[in-house]
Amino acid sequence: MTEDLLSGLSIPDDADSEEAAAIAAAVGAHLHDQTAAAVAAAADEEETWDEKRWQYAGRLDSVTGCARRVPSGAPTNAWAASGRTDRF
């Protein structure tokens, strides 16, 4: 995507060195902001129990007959969490 943006970039022929530097700085800042936003979005995609804790607690209740609250620090991998049901 960055290459697409740069290939379409043109600096006017009558731009002096200060104007060209300002254009380059603005484009550089924009690309930096896009990269930072992509990194932040990737960090937000971390798997959590936020949506699944109650579903998993219900499954534990139906299988073991004992309702337990799943701690937020429990492994998000269901197989790993199932091995720790005695600790919940």
Curated annotation (Swiss-Prot):
This is Propionyl-CoA carboxylase, protein PccX subunit. Its EC number is 6.4.1.3. Coiled coil: none annotated. Pathway: Metabolic intermediate metabolism; propanoyl-CoA degradation; succinyl-CoA from propanoyl-CoA: step 1/3. It catalyses: propanoyl-CoA + hydrogencarbonate + ATP = (S)-methylmalonyl-CoA + ADP + phosphate + H(+). It is an enzyme of class 6 (ligase). GO terms for molecular function: propionyl-CoA carboxylase activity. The propionyl coenzyme A carboxylase (PCC) complex is composed of three subunits: PccA (biotin carboxylase and biotin-carboxyl carrier), PccB (carboxyltransferase) and PccX. Part of the propionyl coenzyme A carboxylase (PCC) complex involved in propionate utilization and in the production of the poly(3-hydroxybutyrate-co-3-hydroxyvalerate)(PHBV), which is a water-insoluble biopolymer used as intracellular energy reserve material when cells grow under conditions of nutrient limitation. The complex catalyzes the carboxylation of propionyl-CoA to methylmalonyl-CoA. PCC is also able to catalyze the carboxylation of acetyl-CoA. PccX could be responsible for the interaction of the biotin carboxylase and carboxyltransferase subunits. Disruption phenotype: Cells lacking pccB and pccX genes accumulate a high level of propionyl-CoA, which would then inhibit CoA-dependent enzymes such as succinyl-CoA synthetase and could partially inhibit the TCA cycle. Also affected in growth and glucose utilization. Cells are unable to produce PHBV and show morphological abnormalitiess such as a decrease of PHBV granules. The keyword Iron does not apply. Keywords: Ligase. The keyword Signal does not apply.
